[in-house]
Amino acid sequence: MTTGADADARRTYDEERAYVSAVSPTKLVVAKGFVPNMRVPGEIYVNERLRELVLDELRAYCDEDRRGGGYSPAVKQIANVAALPGVVRASIALPDVHSGYGFAIGNVAAFDCGDDDAIVSPGGVGFDINCGVRLLRTNLTEAEVGPVKEALAQSLFDHIPVGVGSRGIIPTSPAALEAALEMGMDWSLREGYAWAEDKEHTEEYGRMLNADPSKVSARAKKRGLPQMGTLGAGNHYAEIQVVDEIYDEFAAKKMGIDRVGQICIMIHSGSRGLGHQVATDSLTAMERAMERDGIEVNDRQLACAKISSQEGQDYLAAMACAANYAWVNRSSMTFLCRQAFAKMFGKPPDELDMHVVYDVSHNIAKFEEHIVDGEMKTLLVHRKGSTRAFPPHHPLIPVDYQYTGQPVLIGGTMGTCSYILTGTEKGMRDTFGSTCHGAGRARSRNKSRHVLQYEDVLAKLKTKGIAIRVASPKLVMEEAPESYKDVTEVVNTCHDAGISKKCVKLRPIAVVKG
């Protein structure tokens, strides 16, 4: 049930703004009272330029005649999450924050498992469960790949099914899907679609152990069965990138990146229709649980259930299956990508040094240990449009990265640069070991379609020397750089705030999109 959702409806922008204060050049704090029932403050990591985007959205909201439909501005959503039962320390927004379903995209919130009332919310994970990014390195250089980038882009386009409704070429029976949902990358390894090292360089080692396929509906499985090893549409892509700058040579070398001009491949995809259906199914069950348990929220999109409830446990088990599916999906596309490169360059993938640098999730909820008010607690950390960024010496990151901190992969927009960051101790203390995940929308998909022409977007990419293959050209306006914030501003804000550290900058030379 909702409560107090419109209690602040009559406030002017100046009245709203009085609750939001800058406490440093990279952080705003949203005080309790901004929305009803806040248990903790909101914290928004933005520099001066990005701050204006957040506040402009709030100003536009205050100037509207009526608030019906659509999403609340991100700052409201951050505050509404701060009112959820069991939330600790703060509801945190990263610099790429923008409004989404329930939680803002770019929101991190943690809930105390020692609190019987603490909740889990599908809106805090999102519909594309374990949407994430994987980076492969190679021993190839731009000088070698540049002359064949058009042919290589076409080869990737031919090997990896892309676009809305795309069907996979990885043979998957219903029994195999059940196994993949339970086993994650262990299934990929068993079936020959992954290398053992791939698993070591994946968040959670590519498998959430609490997965229970019996908690995934038949409809979700039906949607997921034909989509294994497919890229999908929207902001998903496979991109051939060049190392453009190295900021931390020690960390980069640990990742196998040792020179400017080195070729890498970035794959951005998630759990496709299966994950979307898991989220949809859970929302209905949680609305009933809220009525039964008397859980009150400020926004009905924040449907949730107690972590300890049957509905909460069922969602977490199904979400884990969708997360495992996404890791299998990215592993399958890695297999297809390695095939495409091997065919183009006449060498097996291992001779091309096509190793996984790391694979990170952007939409997930996980049980983690964090210090809160001087006490170690087990928390259910929701990351929606944000990335885990654990520091050096953390036990949950691979041996290879114990001295550097976890690699964090930040995808840019179509045609702009991407980054590799590393996790820090300050991030562990301040943001539950989390940082940004990308550029973050500055313009809605609908508005992008109305103000941009797809021919212009494609022409700009070509003038930058970027080979592009797109399954749905008329949708590329939604993903144009003009539709997003500046990813460099986002990354620099996180670096300046100390919650992650810049390591490598990558620029695209070929893009494959749905």
Curated annotation (Swiss-Prot):
Mn(2+) 1 binds at residues 128, 131, 236. Ligation probably proceeds through 3 nucleotidyl transfer steps, with 2',3'-cyclic phosphate termini being hydrolyzed to 3'-P termini in a step that precedes 3'-P activation with GMP. In the first nucleotidyl transfer step, RTCB reacts with GTP to form a covalent RTCB-histidine-GMP intermediate with release of PPi; in the second step, the GMP moiety is transferred to the RNA 3'-P; in the third step, the 5'-OH from the opposite RNA strand attacks the activated 3'-P to form a 3',5'-phosphodiester bond and release GMP. It catalyses: a 3'-end 3'-phospho-ribonucleotide-RNA + a 5'-end dephospho-ribonucleoside-RNA + GTP = a ribonucleotidyl-ribonucleotide-RNA + GMP + diphosphate; a 3'-end 2',3'-cyclophospho-ribonucleotide-RNA + a 5'-end dephospho-ribonucleoside-RNA + GTP + H2O = a ribonucleotidyl-ribonucleotide-RNA + GMP + diphosphate + H(+). Catalytic component of the tRNA-splicing ligase complex. It comes from Ostreococcus lucimarinus (strain CCE9901). Mn(2+) 2 binds at residues 131, 268, 362. The active site is at residue 437. Keywords: GTP-binding, Ligase, Manganese, Metal-binding, Nucleotide-binding, tRNA processing. It is an enzyme of class 6 (ligase). Pfam families: RtcB (PF01139). Catalytic subunit of the tRNA-splicing ligase complex that acts by directly joining spliced tRNA halves to mature-sized tRNAs by incorporating the precursor-derived splice junction phosphate into the mature tRNA as a canonical 3',5'-phosphodiester. May act as an RNA ligase with broad substrate specificity, and may function toward other RNAs. The keyword Metal-binding applies. Transmembrane segments: none annotated. InterPro entries: RtcB, RtcB-like_sf, RtcB_euk. This is RNA-splicing ligase RtcB homolog. Belongs to the RtcB family. One of its GO terms (cellular component) is nucleus. Coiled coil: none annotated. Its EC number is 6.5.1.8. One of its GO terms (biological process) is tRNA splicing, via endonucleolytic cleavage and ligation. One of its GO terms (molecular function) is RNA ligase (GTP) activity.
